[in-house]
Curated annotation (Swiss-Prot):
The lineage of its organism: Eukaryota, Metazoa, Ecdysozoa, Arthropoda, Hexapoda. It catalyses: O-phospho-L-seryl-[protein] + H2O = L-seryl-[protein] + phosphate; O-phospho-L-threonyl-[protein] + H2O = L-threonyl-[protein] + phosphate. InterPro entries: PPM-type-like_dom_sf, PPM-type_phosphatase-like_dom, PPTC7. Its EC number is 3.1.3.16. The gene is fig. It comes from the Eukaryota. One of its GO terms (cellular component) is mitochondrial matrix. This is Protein phosphatase PTC7 homolog fig.
Amino acid sequence: MITCLRNWPLLLKRFSVHQIHQFTQLSGRFERPPQSGKSSRDPYLVTVVQGRSKKPRFPGERSNQRFGEDSWFVSSTPLAEVMGVADGVGGWRDLGVDAGRFAKELMSCCSGQTQLSDFDGRSPRNMLIAGFQELSHREHPVVGSSTACLATMHRKDCTLYTANLGDSGFLVVRNGRVLHRSVEQTHDFNTPYQLTVPPEDRKESYYCDKPEMAVSTRHSLLPGDLVLLATDGLFDNMPESMLLSILNGLKERGEHDLLVGASRVVEKARELSMNASFQSPFAIKARQHNVSYSGGGKPDDITLILSSVEVPNA
């Protein structure tokens, strides 16, 4: 059976990246946007987005809300702050498919759910289910597959709700320590759970995971907590201790300081991904699964959404 799982032998092959395209988008417009129904006392998120493509943009790629084959979105409603990341599965390139387009369209469909009148932000898994259903039932479906991680902060109870499918993920950092971290969902080494829309004439040849398989969690948040969403390009290359070291160096939690911190994280992860001698988390996992790998980082697209929980001044 042909599966839609990531083609990991391709990823294990070392290759040289001569040019890295960088696209940075400040997300200050997501900070305390004016919304009817939102109390001035409600907590809110200060959010920035940063990322790197592993290769220069190819013709036709839209850089907006994409870093290579990764995609992301950030949205705000009267009841919740919402964000998501998705990692398009690169194996589709062998079939001439833009692997990042599926991730982009999936995030667009999920983001669209936040505009519905009954959206309350407490079930990102339902948002993922509805978004994927919309994408897969289009008259002309977008072929491809992707991991997905969605998170919402509900304003009234200051609670983080998450849904994660695959090996993208999230962290909650409080007082310099990781309070919560998502768990990867994989079928085998470097073969994550993923949502898939196969070609119409080959549906029977593909095994596809379902959005209902996403792991849902909820976590109470406090002012000053950091919430981080990222694709595996970050987690496969940067140890948690190194990530914490950079985040703990933030002196303030304003938009500028968060952007500086996010940029440092992404740049360090990119540097490590190109280091052939670094014992990256990816290299360690390969060894644990008895997979032949020479060591070093894993060149990949990197997407990071970094948020700080804040409350209005009295």
